[in-house]
A protein has these predicted regions:
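Substrate-recognition "cap/lid" segment bordering the active-site pocket of phosphatases
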Residues: 92, 118-173, 179-193, 197
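Structural recognition of alpha->loop->beta junctions
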Residues: 131-142, 213-235
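N-terminal helical cap/lid subdomain that shapes the substrate entry/recognition surface
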Residues: 3-97, 101
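Phosphate- and divalent-cation-binding pockets in alpha/beta enzyme and binding domains
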Residues: 24, 98, 121-124, 184, ...
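Conserved Rossmann-like nucleotide-cofactor binding loop
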Residues: 13, 20, 119, 180, ...
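Short beta->alpha linker loops
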Residues: 20, 94-98, 117, 151, ...
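Acidic, Mg2+-coordinating phosphoryl-transfer loop and its flanking beta/alpha structural elements
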Residues: 174-225
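Substrate-recognition element of Asp-dependent hydrolases with the DxDx(T/V) motif
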Residues: 25, 102-127, 141
Length: 241
């Protein structure tokens, strides 16, 4: 079996976007929470609290419901505001150390992104760091219906479809910083198996962003404690194929 593609999460995996996402979230919530500055949800009071809430909930909809107190109808409206507010905020997130080196060293393999951020915002960041040509498919939250967000595998399937690769006797690698990313990858593997494909999905946890995969109920296949660990893991997988 060969590695046909490497799929990535974006926030907390390719880039450290926490500070930008906090500010964008505040702007979005001002449409729903009167006097937000005096009624700031705990999750937005610090980077640490934001990351704690982000890892606690399965996806952005749960985050907005339980951490910010929005109704389902308000969450739908907030979803429509995320892309324009992200694009309006010109702040560029920092790419994790040596990530451009890692991506360029794996450029012989097709790359895609499955994210709950907006695809245009992701592309703009990749272009700034001059690695946009390495990514052949970018699926953002707006490319998938609200009922099919992670860990539903729909975004994974759509991303792979755009990559136009062979699925049979193939290995797909998925890299993410959240337990739900691992579940997301395994859900996609189960779908491919149900369709008769001999497709193996290897899930790598991006622990360099600060999460603790040892505490996860659903464990990744590998853990990257630094970005360059990803290269070592890919080489290990290739040697076993």
């Amino acid at each position: 079996m060969k590695i046909s593609a490497i799929l990535w999460d974006y926030d907390g995996t390719l880039v450290n976007s926490v500070k930008k996402n906090i500010e964008v979230t505040k702007e979005v919530l001002k449409n729903f929470i009167p006097d937000l500055d005096n009624n700031l949800p705990r999750a937005l009071t610090s980077v640490e609290n934001y990351e704690e809430a982000n890892y606690k909930y399965k996806n952005w909809r749960e985050l907005y419901k339980f951490a910010y107190g929005l109704t389902d109808e308000q969450i739908d409206e907030a979803g429509k505001l995320w892309s324009p507010y992200q694009l309006k905020d010109a702040t560029l997130p920092d790419m994790f150390d040596k990530m451009d080196y890692v991506v360029n060293n794996l450029s012989n393999i097709k790359h895609g992104i499955c994210s709950q951020n907006c695809s245009k915002n992701i592309y703009n960041t990749l272009k700034h760091y001059t690695i946009e040509k390495c990514f052949h498919s970018i699926i953002g939250y707006e490319d998938i219906s609200y009922t099919e967000q992670k860990p539903n595998p729909k975004a994974f399937l759509k991303c792979v479809e755009k990559l136009d690769i062979s699925l049979d006797n193939s290995i797909l690698v998925y890299i993410g910083d959240h337990q739900e990313d691992t579940i997301f990858g395994k859900n996609a593997e189960e779908f491919y198996k149900s369709q008769g494909y001999n497709t193996k999905i290897i899930c790598i946890a991006a622990s360099y962003s600060g999460n603790t995969p040892n505490d996860w109920i659903v464990k990744p296949d590998f853990t990257a404690y630094s970005t360059t660990d990803i290269l070592d893991i890919i080489n290990k997988v290739l040697q076993k194929k």
